[in-house]
Regions:
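Canonical tetratricopeptide repeat
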Residues: 413, 453, 487, 521, ...
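Acidic, contiguous internal or C-terminal segments within carbohydrate-active enzymes
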Residues: 1, 60-111, 252
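TPR alpha-solenoid repeat register
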Residues: 410, 443-444, 450, 484, ...
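Extended, loop-rich substrate-binding clefts of extracytoplasmic carbohydrate-active enzymes
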Residues: 26-82, 209-240
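A contiguous, surface-exposed recognition patch within enzymatic or periplasmic domains that forms
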Residues: 3-8, 14, 93-101, 105-247, ...
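Residue-level recognition of tetratricopeptide repeat
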Residues: 381-382, 416, 456, 490, ...
Length: 794
């Protein structure tokens, strides 16, 4: 067809669509660990892999900042195959359970003749969060505030006037796509439906609003829709758990196709439809590569209605008609075979039946209105799993604990909630309460998770002996063995007992062969034991699993020898200028969490030297912490001083280890105002507001000339303490210190609006005029306010 089967946007016009802002239309968007991908506009690590069969894979990888999970996608083209194969992997690098979603969204060109191609068993679609539902393809009610009661085919783009999402209910088919009737071509996605649960279409709509967004996002390439394919999820939001150090992987395929139109079934090899034209049946077949002597067979009850042989290629789809001879069309079975008798694709019509339309989701009840402790726990867990923005899961856990203080699940959940927010000591009694209930009648519980979590709360407090005991008890449960043995090996390394560490890391890997962090730690242990050849063999094997295992690549360098510099050069080439500083910190922490502080320092200094010493402040705080844990207090203080001198712009610590770093910096350098400021940022982001405000107040005591901490303190005073006058005073001082800072301008404007201080605001507005002009929302609000009170502007 000589066409772009994925929407090709010839210009880059970023719009404020993505979770963190900039976003462009076109191509295939990969949304993870949530929608839209927070790092959409950030660089990614990449490499190219070539194979003997002529296929080429481009790998992209990142360790994302929000939840510290790792995602990889390998894009492969094969000679003679008309599809793009995507091999994807997601890996939880953390010691705690995490959640993720993965939606791969190709954009496709749309016109009035475009329609979506959902599987034939899809009879209903959901809105986001399943808050609304519609029959499909014929909508018969109100959906997105549009009245479709007359019966409207919403699979057709021309029938959807407003921005609309719809996601299919469960399907037993492996495909979803879209088709342009005017050019007889479309795009199809194929993946195993057991994993690929999500099948969705999104459009800006064909009305005025949609056309406005066409202009926002492109100059000349026109409207598009997104065909969204969800792996391990069927809705947005819909999140799946990744247990500590767990990896999930899958394959998915995107392909152009022609002639078939409304697909009835598809595989990565072939796409087919079977339809009725008056008294005849028709088969249309498309294949993604060249096949000789393909057999098309249509039968019913042992009787053959079509049996034909064709040479196939993507350039030449086949259409075959056959007489029905009175047979019930929906009882026909279609099979397509290659010349070896292997089934390429098959289809048997769905039974005619009226399927029920599912109910939309219901909002969570207030905790006091939920009768059972189990439902309180499950509601709280759902809110955590789905990252709900307004409901607080702890309200449900604590309501349950008020009724039954020893409940295992809610105590464990509360402990995890606090652990995720850096409250290691506060989490400990909840885990202990869960364990007390578990062992009341049996010292050997079936569930080892509370022991494992207790181990981590103790380890993060530096209570290694107690943590060791808790982790060992957790290994009595098979579900915790891989993560608990890994934690034991870390403590063994901290104790310099590398023989015992090797025993434990091997047990961990037996339970989780793809634990990339355990592989790095085993390489480190083997090096420490002088078993360099075994370490090199392990590293080679590990890199065949994950080329972006930076810890293993660094270990290859640490092994020394003639190839050491080459190993370092290859690692640095992979971690080129696109690699985030946060990834360097992550990989350094992999070493530090096992007491390998010298190795952690060497790795992080690569970033420092690469940037001539001018780096993100947390780099030096990490280096200071590594020195402090190595009992080199003078070096630690020197690093902490350097950290305090780095530019504080956009420094938002969010790693649990960074709490320990900043607390240690405050211990050794109590007058470091920036360390208090950064720690306050962590606490506020973790919704530990009292701790945040206390840290910011201490920062201001030490340095009241830093406008951002004053601005942050104002937010805390106003939103969490109802200290409105103090909040306004902080903002006014922040603005006086630096009136060019846009957010202080906007925040002060907003706060004054709450006080009704309009003319004071107008007077201050001139000074910050060009700032608010740059911040469009602030500029519009300023003008709106002046107009409302009779003040003109120019």
């Amino acid at each position: 067809k000589q066409r772009h089967f994925v929407y090709y946007n010839q210009v880059i016009k970023p719009a404020l669509v993505g979770l963190t802002g900039p976003w462009i239309s076109g191509g295939i968007e990969f949304n993870w660990p949530q929608h839209h991908r927070p790092s959409t506009y950030l660089p990614t690590e990449c490499t190219i892999e070539e194979f003997p069969d002529g296929s080429v894979t481009v790998w992209c990888s990142e360790v994302e900042r929000m939840f510290r999970t790792k995602g990889m996608a390998g894009f492969t083209l094969y000679p003679g195959k008309a599809y793009l194969e995507i091999k994807a992997k997601v890996y939880n690098r953390t010691s705690l359970p995490q959640t993720f979603l993965w939606w791969a969204n190709p954009a496709v060109v749309v016109h009035k003749d475009y329609y979506s191609v959902f599987p034939p068993d899809v009879n209903a679609v959901f809105d986001h969060g399943k808050r609304a539902v519609s029959s499909f393809p014929i909508a018969t009610g109100v959906y997105y505030k549009q009245d479709y009661s007359s019966g409207v085919d919403i699979s057709k783009y021309k029938n959807i006037p407003v921005p609309t999402s719809y996601m299919a209910i469960n399907s037993k088919y492996d495909f979803v796509g879209g088709y342009e009737e005017n050019v007889e071509a479309g795009l199809l996605h194929v993946a195993d439906h057991h994993v690929n649960a999500g099948k969705k279409q999104w459009t800006w709509g064909c009305g005025d609003f949609g056309q406005a967004w066409d202009r926002n996002l492109t100059d000349e390439d026109g409207p598009y829709i997104e065909l969204m394919t969800g792996m391990y999820c069927d809705n947005q939001p819909d999140f799946t758990w990744l247990q500590p150090y767990e990896e999930k992987e899958w394959k998915q395929y995107f392909m152009p196709y022609s002639a078939v139109g409304m697909v009835k079934n598809a595989t990565k090899e072939a796409i087919v439809t079977l339809k009725k034209n008056e008294y005849k049946g028709e088969v249309i077949l498309y294949t993604t590569s060249v096949y000789k002597s393909v057999r098309i067979l249509v039968t019913c009850g042992g009787k053959v209605y079509l049996d034909s042989i064709h040479d196939m290629s993507p350039a030449e789809p086949v259409k075959e008609s056959f007489a029905l001879n009175g047979v019930e069309f929906d009882s026909l079975k279609l099979c397509v075979y290659d010349n070896n008798g292997k089934v390429l694709v098959e289809y048997e019509a769905e039974k005619k039946e009226i399927k029920p339309i599912p109910d939309p989701a219901k909002a969570a009840k207030d905790p006091k209105d939920i009768a059972s402790i189990e439902q309180l726990y499950l509601t709280g867990l759902h809110l955590e799993q789905y990252r709900h923005a307004t409901y607080n899961p702890t309200d449900y856990y604590m309501e349950a604990l008020s009724r039954e203080p020893g409940d295992v699940r809610c105590n464990n959940a509360m402990g995890l909630f606090l652990m995720r927010r850096g409250q290691f000591a506060k989490a400990q009694p909840y885990f202990e309460a869960a364990i007390a209930t578990l062992i009341e009648r049996n010292p050997n519980p079936i569930d080892g998770e509370p022991h494992y979590n207790l181990g981590w709360s103790l380890k993060m407090q530096g209570k290694f002996d107690e943590a060791y005991d808790a982790f060992f008890k957790a290994t009595w449960s098979a579900a915790q063995q891989d993560s608990a043995y890994y934690a034991l090996a870390q403590i063994d390394c901290i104790r310099n007992d590398f023989e015992k560490a090797l025993e434990h890391i091997d047990r961990s890997l037996v339970r989780n062969w793809h634990n990339h962090k355990a592989r790095q730690l085993k390489a480190s242990i083997l090096r420490k034991l002088g078993k360099k050849e075994a370490a090199a063999t392990l590293i080679a094997e590990s890199l065949s699993i994950d080329k972006f295992n930076i810890g293993c690549r660094f270990e290859l360098y640490l092994l020394g020898g003639e190839s050491a510099q080459q190993a370092l050069d290859e690692m640095m080439a992979l971690m080129n200028e696109t690699t985030s500083v946060h990834s360097y910190i992550e990989y350094a922490l992999d070493f530090a969490n096992a007491g390998l502080y010298a190795e952690a320092e060497r790795l992080l200094l690569l970033w420092v030297n690469k940037n001539d010493g001018i780096v993100y402040p947390m780099v030096y705080y990490a280096l200071g912490y590594f020195a402090s844990k190595s009992d080199d207090v003078l070096k630690a203080i020197d690093y902490y001083k350097k950290a305090s001198q780095m530019a504080p712009d956009y420094c938002f610590p969010n790693k649990l280890e960074e709490v320990l770093m900043l607390q240690d910096a405050n211990r050794l350098q109590p007058n470091d105002s920036k360390a208090w400021y950064y720690l306050g940022n962590f606490w506020y982001g973790a919704r530990q507001h009292d701790e945040a405000i206390a840290c910011w107040e201490r920062s201001v005591e030490l340095d009241d000339q830093f406008p951002t901490v004053l601005r942050n303190l104002a937010l805390g005073y106003y939103n969490k303490r109802n200290r409105k006058e103090d909040a306004l005073a902080c903002l006014e001082k922040a603005f006086a210190l630096d009136y060019e800072r846009r957010f202080e301008v906007f925040d002060q404007w907003s706060l004054r609006q709450h006080f009704g201080v309009v003319y004071q605001r107008a007077a201050f507005g001139g000074k910050g005029y060009y700032v608010s002009e740059r911040l469009h929302s602030g500029f519009g609000k300023r003008n709106e306010s002046f107009d409302q009170y009779g003040r003109g502007y120019s």
